[in-house]
């Protein structure tokens, strides 16, 4: 923070945000409402924190910010497999599902 930033009301940006407990609750609810769910952990990038993508049997998916440890714990709690997307990639059914979605202009 610069010397005058505090006087101007500027705040530092960046830093690690803590995962939202509501996100974990949402992921549990989402997974329990679908079958054949698998978790794919996406690594931290310069733009985003670590995230997990849950993919159902039909390719429907959802993504939320969560720690890798949290994602593994979620998988254990739900009894679903957890994969590292950097090693295994995304499942084809996820790409097929996304391709069928209506295009937004």
Predicted regions and their residues:
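Intrinsic disorder
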Residues: 1-105
């Amino acid at each position: 923070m610069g010397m005058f930033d505090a006087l101007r009301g500027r705040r530092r940006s960046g830093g690690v945000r803590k995962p939202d407990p509501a996100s974990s609750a949402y992921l549990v609810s989402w997974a329990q409402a679908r079958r054949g769910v698998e978790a794919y952990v996406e690594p931290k990038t310069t733009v985003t924190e670590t995230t997990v993508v849950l993919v159902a049997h039909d390719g429907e998916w959802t993504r939320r910010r969560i720690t890798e440890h949290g994602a593994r714990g979620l998988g254990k709690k739900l009894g679903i497999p957890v994969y590292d997307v950097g090693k295994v990639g995304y499942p084809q059914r996820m790409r097929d599902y996304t391709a069928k979605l209506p295009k937004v202009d």
